[in-house]
Amino acid sequence: GGGPGGWGCAIAEVPYIYYKMYGDESVLADFLPQVLRYFDYLEAHSENDLVVSDQKNEWCLGDWCTPEEIVIPEPFVNNYFYIRTINRLLEFCRVLNRNDLVPELTALAERKKAAIVRTYFDAQTGDFCRNVQGANAFAVDLGLGDDRTFANMVRHYEQNTWFDTGIFGTDIVTRVLFERGHATLAYRLLTSEEKYSFWHWQSTGCTTFPEYWTYNRSQNHPMFGAVIKYLFRFILGITQEGAGWKNIVIAPKFADGLNSAEGSILTESGRVSVRFVRSAGRVSFRIEIPEGVQARLAYAGSHPLTAGVHEFSLPEETTAR
């Protein structure tokens, strides 16, 4: 892989996503001891509680393929992924009832967070790593910083509506904005027509994603495609509680300038489809739910959904930012 964080931590992320998609707990049990061993590896490549190296003569990348020179520090990014993976393993423990591991893992995560704050947080500004290349989004995603941290991040992207981030920061910035009530800004970044944008690729004739914002090297590389899932998770609002798509929640986050959308995903339980049209202060929904699941529409209240097709017309909530 390319580094100990964004690449190596797939050892936990892949089985976790498999569990979420299919509800199969056995994959978590299979990988839990392997992830613990990987944590030993990360500890052996850490200094002052920051991951600083990989195997000798191997890459130790942090974020990758930023449009301009990479300045976000590699140990900051790798510790972010270490902490996020500890949190994933805590989810393993919850599902598998491995409460014996929780105190040690919780303490480990707190140590790693403290190292990030100690090394990279500026108490005068509220920024991490000077808020470069999405750094504040990494911190906010871990619950670090203060109110200024997120506010400074939002201000930066309101003033610079293009991605200055690499393959990880692009994903994290977009998700953090959607999750924290700034769907419109996330949508503006996704549809930006500035120099480093998905539109710019399209405008120059690309039919696949290049490896770099600047078109270097491969012209068919999937790694910037992580944000595509947010079209379904946030814009259409197709989410789930639990695992295996047995408890479906439709919770769209509307963005100014986007008045209609339609799409579907094929889950372990069957196809889930959503269409919405916003007009004259109301939202018309058409939602299809598969058999054998619980489901609800979480918009303007909570509306139970049984198997089949449902059509709603609801007053629009004034929450888009």
Indicate residue ranges for each PLM-predicted region.
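Non-catalytic C-terminal accessory modules of carbohydrate-active enzymes
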Residues: 184-321
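Carbohydrate-binding/catalytic loop surfaces
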Residues: 1-6, 10, 22, 51-77, ...
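Active-site acid/base region of carbohydrate-active enzymes
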Residues: 6-9, 13, 21-80, 93-138, ...
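Long, well-ordered core segments of solenoidal/helical folds
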Residues: 31-51, 107-125, 144-163, 181-201
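Alpha-solenoid helical repeat architecture
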Residues: 164-171
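Well-ordered alpha-helical scaffold segments within catalytic/enzyme domains
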Residues: 11-27, 81-99, 137-147, 171-180, ...
